[in-house]
Amino acid sequence: MISALFLMNGKGEVLISRIYRDDISRGVANAFRLEVIGSQETRSPVKLIGSTSFMYIKVGNIYIVGVSRQNVNACMVFEVLHQLVDIFKSYFDNLDEDSIRNNFVLVYELLDEILDFGYPQNCSTDVLKLYITQGQGKLKSLDKLKQDKISKITIQATGTTPWRTPDIKYKRNELYIDVVESVNLLMSAEGNILRADVSGQVMMKCFLSGMPECKFGMNDKVIMDREKSTNGGSAARSGARRANGIEIDDITFHQCVRLGKFDSDRTVSFIPPDGEFELMRYRTTEHINLPFKVIPIVREMGRTRLECSVTVKSNFSSKMFGANVKVIIPTPKNTAVCKIVVAAGKAKYMPEQDAIIWRIRRFPGDTEFTLRAEVELMASVNLDKKAWSRPPISMEFQVTMFTASGFSVRFLKVVEKSNYTPIKWVRYLTKAGTYQNRI
């Protein structure tokens, strides 16, 4: 359990304090200010001062600190702290000192509803907004609500689906799915993959009437292998990688997903919240299809000259394209002049970044472009100066309708008692995480 919560500014001043248990006094905030905020060293997010544990996150100039003297689950505390950030931002867009001071009554109301005696009770923004609302700068409390509305709030807050009200109606029932993946890569100068993984998330925008039951199907390897054995091993041989499914290492679901159903038959079934939400997160490290391959060639011609050739090749279909592609090619700190020739896009030497920035607005699939540069270096008088460390080339990009992991939505079924047929849209997007190639 959490004994106390503090919201502090960058100077260590306490903006909000809520003591949930009597084993903590407000004075412990001063110890945190001296040991963490007052220190110039980089600190871990968990700090033990005496017998008191401080777990904190920093958002802008605001520290959100959970305090406990018990053997508390640190992951639970950090989950609550991050949920607090999301809740505060849903009420006032910017989480800064002025917003907290101007809405301190609202913040205390939220803290009292979210935690009870230090135990998390309600972290659902949708439920909290039913009875803690802010209109025209004044907080509307429960005593101003009608009795029937209070009853509905109670039923929803304590029911099986607190994230969704039953009386939602839309003239046009729509469902949007966005599969967004971030590719992380570290490749050696010889072209060997040293580290590669994909972090993905499935975002949904739900505009459905009533209480729809949704069933989501993905090409998980466990599901695909099970279906193959059920069908006697008969499966289409075309697109073998996609047919065999992908191996998901880690997966996390929204609270609306029935985990028991997923554990038993790997079915993702749920009653979705209204509006936008994150259905699931996943991570995979096997059989990653890299969207771009970088082939760097760097020759040091003596102490004052350097020749550089960087070829970037797209590994996806010619029907697709990469958008806003940016290649950052590092140069030595003593660079004087850069002569650059590119086959596509625009490139410029940026002395403040010690790098050549190559931008290609639209990069077609199954294509390669090359940048060539002659770099003249200033002669160094200091003979003891260290040699150029050759930092890695990094990339930024976005590729639509492509997934590096091979993840795909197989089906999405919606069942509701009014028997409507919703309009469904699916979009895929792959972007660069930490995408680097050593030279």
From Swiss-Prot:
Residues covered by the MHD domain: 172-438
PANTHER family cross-referenced by the UniProt entry: AP COMPLEX SUBUNIT MU
Record's keyword terms, sorted: Cell membrane, Coated pit, Endocytosis, Membrane, Phosphoprotein, Protein transport, Transport
Family matches, as InterPro entries: Adaptor_comp_med_subunit, AP2_Mu_C_sf, AP2_Mu_N, AP_mu_sigma_su, Clathrin_mu, Clathrin_mu_CS, Longin-like_dom_sf, MHD
One Pfam entry name: Adap_comp_sub
GO MF terms, alphabetically ordered: clathrin adaptor activity
UniProt protein name: AP-2 complex subunit mu
BP terms from Gene Ontology: clathrin-dependent endocytosis; intracellular protein transport
Example of a GO cellular component annotation carried by this entry: AP-2 adaptor complex
PTM statement from Swiss-Prot or TrEMBL: Phosphorylated.
Annotated localization: Cell membrane; Membrane, Coated pit
Annotated source species: Dictyostelium discoideum (Social amoeba)
The keyword Transport belongs to this UniProt entry's keyword annotation: yes
